[in-house]
Amino acid sequence: MQIFVKTLTGKTITLEVEPSDTIENVKAKIQDKEGIPPDQQRLIFAGKQLEDGRTLSDYNIQKESTLHLVLRLRGGMQIFVKTLTGKTITLEVEPSDTIENVKAKIQDKEGIPPDQQRLIFAGKQLEDGRTLSDYNIQKESTLHLVLRLRGGMQIFVKTLTGKTITLEVEPSDTIENVKAKIQDKEGIPPDQQRLIFAGKQLEDGRTLSDYNIQKESTLHLVLRLRGGMQIFVKTLTGKTITLEVEPSDTIENVKAKIQDKEGIPPDQQRLIFAGKQLEDGRTLSDYNIQKESTLHLVLRLRGGMQIFVKTLTGKTITLEVEPSDTIENVKAKIQDKEGIPPDQQRLIFAGKQLEDGRTLSDYNIQKESTLHLVLRLRGGMQIFVKTLTGKTITLEVEPSDTIENVKAKIQDKEGIPPDQQRLIFAGKQLEDGRTLSDYNIQKESTLHLVLRLRGGMQIFVKTLTGKTITLEVEPSDTIENVKAKIQDKEGIPPDQQRLIFAGKQLEDGRTLSDYNIQKESTLHLVLRLRGGMQIFVKTLTGKTITLEVEPSDTIENVKAKIQDKEGIPPDQQRLIFAGKQLEDGRTLSDYNIQKESTLHLVLRLRGGMQIFVKTLTGKTITLEVEPSDTIENVKAKIQDKEGIPPDQQRLIFAGKQLEDGRTLSDYNIQKESTLHLVLRLRGGV
């Protein structure tokens, strides 16, 4: 195909190229035509400097595209790089060098990998693809080198519309940097962004670590409406104060403005709008407070009130408090009276556990209200609840919590009424009145949440003879229950029944709703053949294991038998037959595995690893892989996720195209490495 190269003088050169030509090849063609040495050429396309080792198709350069040629200045210049230890490094550079090039030079001198380097000039973090001249970095300028804490971290930014944005950041990033990243993702100018964390508005010049923002923290993004507005604040004496505000101001900001005008400390102010007490961390727009709205200001009484605290032993304690006291303050008063450390206290009011940072008035606790005090078994713990959609919820619980309490916490988080929740642990449905410790549920255990569909339903079971049986069931029935119903109707013992739905063999401990079996679904009943057959499993050490199996056994069943014999957990086993990796849900007969066949057992390196695949559109795909996966396997996983046939995929790592038959470990591709995916153009262009 033909492409054009435009020089700074305005001259246009025409070149004959192919999509597979490297940038290096193109520079050689320019040298042939114009006599300019490749090392003095910089080629730019779509605003990006092109790298020698990449191809035209990598950059999606098509026929009749125009590249721009910039000449490198001869001679270059010196710049200095100062590290946090105070050491200064001198580098030979050119104005046209990219920040990436500069980091490579620092790596040559100091051995610091580029991905751990952050370069700062004039208070700004420098981006890899930009050049020194883009930032007006001149000879003898000094850059500052900050090391990235390994790998950075992810934080979330939640907008008022409920959308959540994920950002890659570092503790040392300033709020200004974070706003710039949000602008890159969402297009919102930084001057219209207000970021809130823990009820505080974040200041541009401070860093995430200044605010103790850690990995997976959630910031709230509020948009500044241009212009602001006036609101009125009416006191109990009848006086009205006028304030200049913005919809994005927090209640805390408003109280500060009232203090400026009237001298009333914020902690003595309670603001009421539409009958509701306003919380410090929320904004005016959260409460739909618009221009010329009127808030009511009530002063907190200094005198306070009495409340009662009832313990599980039946003892009642009387406390002197104020509506503005936090739950933390109340716990401290209980400690003074009873000697119970606050971290062992849980306070309950109106069936809700009270949070330390909230006040009594937040919970509408009034004089002579009674709180209930429950003691924490030291420390509490976290457990996980996995839903059928695959979502995992984290709960703070204690061994003494009842299943009922746990369902209430799930309702708080997810809005699912307790009477629609069924919790399963170790294959057992959990009963409301029992505690977590009754079921030996320990920290970081995972419960499974199944939703009860209201009422029962009919399903059909079809036998191999063609007979159809009708059963009355509920979505919450286990497969074991269903087999018992079949035994009642047909006299077939459960251990001779195999039930199949949507091509999958159903497991006894799972429920119909686990498999999305709905009313009038049809299951297939297959009788287990008595007798079975033997197969062999060969390990990488050369050891051969003999197993008694049936053609109808699933690969999952086979892995369980291997675990029984050899102690290898199923999630570390990969079984290979006829060169194919076998999938858990399929049966031996699906793969035509017959008596005395030999399977090969490969151990997964514990847990596998994640890698990233970046496309030319900038999209990043995350894959679960193992070092022993071949490039062919990886392409198949990409096809599963993205629908791109393997024969149209080219994978690049460290500038090298990866070959199908080699493994990830052959190329030293480790966890969280990034591969680049280039699509093969069919034919020429």
Swiss-Prot record:
SUPFAM superfamilies from the xrefs?
Ubiquitin-like
Changing R74K: what effect?
A: No effect on ADP-ribosylation
The outcome of changing R72G is: No effect on ADP-ribosylation
Q: Where is this cross-link: Glycyl lysine isopeptide (Lys-Gly) (interchain with G-Cter in ubiquitin)?
A: K6, K11, K27, K29, K33, K48, K63
Residues with the modification ADP-ribosylglycine, per the entry, are G76
Residues annotated as site: Essential for function: H68
Query: Which sequence positions carry the modification called (Microbial infection) ADP-ribosylthreonine?
Result: T66
Q: Name one Pfam family in it.
A: ubiquitin
Molecular-function annotations in GO: protein tag activity; RNA binding; ubiquitin protein ligase binding
Keyword vocabulary terms for this entry: ADP-ribosylation, Cytoplasm, Isopeptide bond, Membrane, Mitochondrion, Mitochondrion outer membrane, Nucleus, Phosphoprotein, Repeat, Ubl conjugation
Q: Where is this site: Interacts with activating enzyme?
A: R54, R72
Q: Which PANTHER family match?
A: UBIQUITIN (PTHR10666)
The UniProt similarity line reads:
Belongs to the ubiquitin family.
Further comment found in the protein's record: Ubiquitin is encoded by 4 different genes. UBA52 and RPS27A genes code for a single copy of ubiquitin fused to the ribosomal proteins eL40 and eS31, respectively. UBB and UBC genes code for a polyubiquitin precursor with exact head to tail repeats, the number of repeats differ between species and strains.
Q: What's the protein called, per UniProt?
A: Polyubiquitin-C
**From what organism does this protein derive?**
Homo sapiens (Human)
